[in-house]
């Protein structure tokens, strides 16, 4: 077991996703069986009791890897020495709220958190934003931590979209989820995202597009299923879960966040996965936007890197461009608020 514990900060620590995260992190699911962790739970004052109750439960679990748990409503205390920051807490959109109002509310959350990360976090901190709108919230946090914390240390969660896409393909093709590689989520974590299977392959080397055509009776049928069923269902899966379950995704979101950090820290293995990272102009995406790309990580401390070289046909380029247009509009709205 490593001698120095890794400090992991979870914002929204008293909320349902934070609750689902903390026990798996303490059990070693995120950083492995040999890395002790110190958990810091950040909450707003009215959420403190829930977070304190979760901390009591963590103590009762007696996890060997869990060194200690701190609960606080002070960002400077929460992010002090943080090596990994998982920004879960966000202002949800309510009925009648305009996008500009939502962005302004979240700027008031993620801006100060970015400043606190800059002030007191570990010099090699890595940050993943889970709270929506995740891509632009990550942009806000990164801008607020600049220039001392490089923007490349910030990412936003699209692993949930990635996993949803893999799950839908696995169900259609009657294969295990682990038998599918190189699915890509492009763009924003929103209804404009583009789940791309044109480069995906099965464990036996068969392209997923061929497997779909074989199962559905031809390439035209496969294309129709992708356009009319698969892409809309992945993009709107969150709304479907709310309708069926009566509340938003919790366990699947927490699982995706854990996998995002695990692969970034320990290595992503075979093929590519998806994460929203700061663009450096890859695939024509404007520099500085936080956009979902195909990524890999060697687990060597350098985080995710965008994998270039995937061909995009006209259809894919149009879908990516539409999602990028939305990201640009969100960035411009935040700039108009004077945040960036």
What does each of the following model-derived ranges do?
Residues 18-19:
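N-terminal Rossmann-fold NAD(P) dinucleotide-binding loop
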Residues 22-32:
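Histidine-anchored nucleotide/phosphate-binding helix
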Residues 30, 34-82, 332-335:
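Conserved N-terminal Rossmann-fold NAD(P) cofactor-binding segment
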Residues 55-84, 90-99, 105-122:
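A structured beta-alpha segment of the ubiquitous adenosine-cofactor-binding alpha/beta core
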Residues 147-151, 162-340:
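C-terminal substrate-binding/catalytic lobe of Rossmann-fold NAD(P)-dependent dehydrogenases
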């Amino acid at each position: 077991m490593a001698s120095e514990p890794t400090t992991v900060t979870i914002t929204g620590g008293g909320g349902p996703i934070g609750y689902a995260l903390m026990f798996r992190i303490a059990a070693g699911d995120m950083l492995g069986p040999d890395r002790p962790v110190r958990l810091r739970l950040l909450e707003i004052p009215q959420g403190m009791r829930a977070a304190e109750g979760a901390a009591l439960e963590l103590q009762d679990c007696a996890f060997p890897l869990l060194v200690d748990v701190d609960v606080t409503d002070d960002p400077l205390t929460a992010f002090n020495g943080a090596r990994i920051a998982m920004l879960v807490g966000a202002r949800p959109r309510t009925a009648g709220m305009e996008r500009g109002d939502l962005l302004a509310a979240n700027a008031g959350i993620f801006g100060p958190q970015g400043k606190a990360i800059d002030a007191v976090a570990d010099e090699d901190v890595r940050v993943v934003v889970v709270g929506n709108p995740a891509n632009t919230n990550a942009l806000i946090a990164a801008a607020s931590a600049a220039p001392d914390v490089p923007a490349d240390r910030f990412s936003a969660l699209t692993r949930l979209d990635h996993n949803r896409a893999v799950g839908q393909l696995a169900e259609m093709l009657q294969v295990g989820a682990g038998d599918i590689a190189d699915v890509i989520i492009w763009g924003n974590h929103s209804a404009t995202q583009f789940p791309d299977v044109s480069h995906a392959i099965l464990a036996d080397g068969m392209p997923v597009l061929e497997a779909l055509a074989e199962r559905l009776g031809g390439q035209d049928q496969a294309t129709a299923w992708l356009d009319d069923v698969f892409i809309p269902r992945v993009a709107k899966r969150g709304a479907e879960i709310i309708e069926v379950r009566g509340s938003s995704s919790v366990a699947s979101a927490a699982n995706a966040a854990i996998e995002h950090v695990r692969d970034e820290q320990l290595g992503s293995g075979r093929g590519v996965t998806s994460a929203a990272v700061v663009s450096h102009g890859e695939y024509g995406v404007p520099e500085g936007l936080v956009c979902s790309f195909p990524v890999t990580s060697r687990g060597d401390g350098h985080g995710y890197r965008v994998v270039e070289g995937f061909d995009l046909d006209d259809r894919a380029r149009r879908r990516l461009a539409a999602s990028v247009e939305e990201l640009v509009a969100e960035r411009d709205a935040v700039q108009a608020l004077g945040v960036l």
